[in-house]
Amino acid sequence: MAAINPWASWGALTDQSWGMTAVDPWASWALCPQYPAWHVEGSLEEGRRATGLPAAQVQEPVTFKDVAVDFTQEEWGQLDLVQRTLYRDVMLETYGHLLSVGNQIAKPEVISLLEQGEEPWSVEQACPQRTCPEWVRNLESKALIPAQSIFEEEQSHGMKLERYIWDDPWFSRLEVLGCKDQLEMYHMNQSTAMRQMVFMQKQVLSQRSSEFCGLGAEFSQNLNFVPSQRVSQIEHFYKPDTHAQSWRCDSAIMYADKVTCENNDYDKTVYQSIQPIYPARIQTGDNLFKCTDAVKSFNHIIHFGDHKGIHTGEKLYEYKECHQIFNQSPSFNEHPRLHVGENQYNYKEYENIFYFSSFMEHQKIGTVEKAYKYNEWEKVFGYDSFLTQHTSTYTAEKPYDYNECGTSFIWSSYLIQHKKTHTGEKPYECDKCGKVFRNRSALTKHERTHTGIKPYECNKCGKAFSWNSHLIVHKRIHTGEKPYVCNECGKSFNWNSHLIGHQRTHTGEKPFECTECGKSFSWSSHLIAHMRMHTGEKPFKCDECEKAFRDYSALSKHERTHSGAKPYKCTECGKSFSWSSHLIAHQRTHTGEKPYNCQECGKAFRERSALTKHEIIHSGIKPYECNKCGKSCSQMAHLVRHQRTHTGEKPYECNKCGKSFSQSCHLVAHRRIHTGEKPYKCNQCERSFNCSSHLIAHRRTHTGEKPYRCNECGKAFNESSSLIVHLRNHTGEKPYKCNHCEKAFCKNSSLIIHQRMHSGEKRFICSECGKAFSGHSALLQHQRNHSEEKLN
């Protein structure tokens, strides 16, 4: 049966943790995280006796007035929309539960108003004189709640209780209403009840202390944090029995902010938060807390509260050191790792620091029969399992084997996670995008991509990161540390994953295979980028020109074309580059290194991309075909250049003379005409050229090499362009036509000379007689006449 307890209704308005299945006010109180949770067998009945509450009270009929929560107009105005909606839902649901259990009651006017969507405060009884008799009756009729009080130090069974601080909603209500007289009377009544409760609590705990503290599974211990809204701050100082093997600490049944434990043999300070998890309920499998939004049940009110925070967006956990807040305890529990070194478990005798062990576990070291010592480092462990795992880190022992693939692990938790890679199990799902993960930590990291949270900040440059591992690697930029060294070539890396990827260049391993075309890759990121070629996906867009890219690195490189940034500078000549790969390739021009060799002909190249393009020549594959003329090309860039012959596009323009070119290399060579630069020099005759292709063709005049042969007549040429022009003699093709007389030519140079006849231009002038000619060949013929005249 759902909750009909007034405390649950009020708790819903403060914590949004409603839905408890309890009728007994003591049971509800025990479940609520703001109050002590007596989950020792029989402690509820003892609690009733200690406070004078009759055990038979739970059998009396419950009226609507017993469970209703009222607000004044002033208080109602202080509630926001979410709180008002929650109040309306709780009141209507509570009234429905009363009817469902057979209570024959008339419908209260407040329920009628809430059902019609009207304000409830209009039906509340007026309180003009601020006497608040309704609240006094509620206080007298309900279970007594400890008020906010501070007690002097008391001694009992080796424990000293210094102070209690409790949150009390009824106390707050009286304080808001200004009921001073009722407040003073309330304090007097509560002080008596508190003394009875403290006495009863110590009696119970003196008998049960060893049971609680001996069960390590009953508590979830974390470092120096408390839920900011749910948990009251309670500060205890305990001194245990020196000869006892278990610690007597009554914090076992409540939340603790700071606990200081002292022992004559050891001195240790522990910052911990202890959360009761109700073992009896876990054993029976009962899920007492049900969420109406997701139809999900929980056996722990803390887990239920975490889950409700997902729906509401409420962030209930605050870390005291940095005041960062979280809506789930797992994320909250991981956060203290950022503050490593601040809250540590320090055991002075052995000077060991414990991050994962609680002081309750470590105290076992004090007894000889329970101490496990690792001789190598003189480190001591409270459990032999910890010793076994610790020893494995030095012996390289991996005792946890997986039979499917033969992989071994040091920790059993690693084995459990690894098994999920075989089963495909991904139980942790992102609420934002639906992406699933194998472990909770991966989900937590992923969620930061949605929230934008970057909690890990570099103390050197202030740069922030979403993941702690990224911060650790980033810090190596400042320190210059590269701890991962390749055993083959001695190259160092600051990422272990980079070393693993680098080692594949030595082994030739390519474990990542494309399911579409079968192509393999050394890096998973390369496979992911390759897969986008098949899908056409380009998720990375430039903000300047809206151009899209398959991977982020390509976008980063492209953005430098807008900014003009060239961060990579050559130390030899000072030349700068936008891309690091271009700098690496450029540096090989200084060293002469050509590490990429063709296995077919042995030709070497400075860049892998140049080798890949060259290898296509041997394969004969020409996958890129022109849709205009059907011509095939081995490279996409060649096809693009070829298509410009059809479109007439010449995108590369000279800023000196305005002449345009279809290829960028032609523009570069043309600019050297203006500058007079001829960087390509022949070693045989010292002749220089402004284009490398001209030098290559010239060298063949010395060697006599003519690699381009005509299949029709067998004539050979030293340039491919000369062969193309020659082939037109066999085919009769004359692609170059004059716009004036429609005359056609097989060579472009012949068309240019012909067009000068129409324009009258004669740019070639004889140096002997000054006569001008339209073509260079005509000038050469004329100059031969002068030579013959001189001979005669």
Swiss-Prot record:
A biological process term (GO) from this entry: regulation of transcription by RNA polymerase II
Gene name of the encoded protein: ZNF606
Residue ranges occupied by any KRAB domain in the UniProt entry: 62-133
InterPro entries: KRAB, KRAB_dom_sf, Znf_C2H2_sf, Znf_C2H2_type
Protein name from the UniProt record: Zinc finger protein 606
Keyword Nucleus tagged: yes
GO MF terms held by the record: DNA binding; zinc ion binding
Entries under Pfam families matching the protein: KRAB (PF01352), zf-C2H2 (PF00096)
ZnF C2H2-type span: 289-311, 317-344, 400-422, 428-450, 456-478, 484-506, 512-534, 540-562, 568-590, 596-618, 624-646, 652-674, 680-702, 708-730, 736-758, 764-786
Any one cellular-component term (Gene Ontology): nucleus
SUPFAM superfamilies linked to this entry: beta-beta-alpha zinc fingers, KRAB domain (Kruppel-associated box)
Annotated tissue distribution: Widely expressed in adult and fetal tissues.
Keyword Signal in record: no
UniProt keyword terms in alphabetical order: DNA-binding, Metal-binding, Nucleus, Repeat, Repressor, Transcription, Transcription regulation, Zinc, Zinc-finger
Location of the protein in the cell: Nucleus
Main location, first listed in the record: nucleus
The family this protein is said to belong to: Belongs to the krueppel C2H2-type zinc-finger protein family.
Gene3D superfamilies: 6.10.140.140, Classic Zinc Finger
Purpose of the protein: May act as a transcriptional repressor.
